[in-house]
Amino acid sequence: LRAVSDTGLFNVLGGTGIIEKVMTQVFWKNLYPQIELWKSKKAQGIETEKVLLRYAVSHIQELIDSEVPGYITEEMYIKPPISQDIKTGAIYKSSKDGLFCIVLSPPCDLAIHGGKFKTDRILVCEIANHDEDNKKVASKSTKRKDKKADIQDAIKNNLTEYYHWLPCNTLFCGGYINFRNVITYPPEEFIAEYGSPVVKVQEYFVKNILNRFSAYYARQGQPDFDFKTEATLILDKIEPAETT
């Protein structure tokens, strides 16, 4: 019990722990002074309970961000996932080939209305094997210090634009999200093959993954046209110039 206590777990989650103190501070300083606002929102038919939950969590995050040390890799994952619903950042294992994938459909597409998803396709990216890909990275150099530098580049996501590192730890075996290996499934097929999520990437990290995923597919942009000429042609078509 002493060993557990020394971790700080009880200090964080105990009845008079840090979370309790922070919540009390947030309640009296940030939320209760705005009670008229929340009463007004409720009168408008807004589901204020869930909004307040999200709002309170964001306040807690603000309070702790400047006080905690650097992240450890386990913080990247939530295991078991809080929700069994299909969520952006949820990691699944295929029942057919045992490969892992991560859901990268935008959260708005995964919203359920009337028992159905807003989208008719679940977008996932395959996760390459952690050790196998690190061996490939290390094999490019002969000296150990160079191998280490190459691996460090890889896990810092500097080696290539289409790989994103997922750390290997006690919660998940890790790997590299391969943005090139994109697959889409109808929701029913996805659920049949993948079942329940194995682990969920924490929201803070999901945003970074989505940003890099979007940037990878937007990197080439659109070829330049002669926009001046095109604009003239379009204007002449919709509003022909008057001839004198």
Regions from the PLM with identified roles:
Residues 82-90, 94, 112, 118-121:
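Cysteine-centered metal-binding/redox modules
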Residues 56, 90, 106, 110, ...:
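Residue-level signal for functionally critical sites in structured catalytic/ligand-binding pockets
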Residues 1-25, 106-109, 161, 167-169, ...:
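A composition-driven signal for long, intrinsically disordered, charge-rich low-complexity tracts
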Residues 1-91:
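Charge-rich interaction segments
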Residues 105-138:
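Compact nucleic-acid interaction/catalytic patches
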Residues 131, 135-244:
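C-terminal terminal-subdomain/extension
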Residues 96-98:
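Active-site beta-strand-loop-beta-strand hairpin of nuclease catalytic cores
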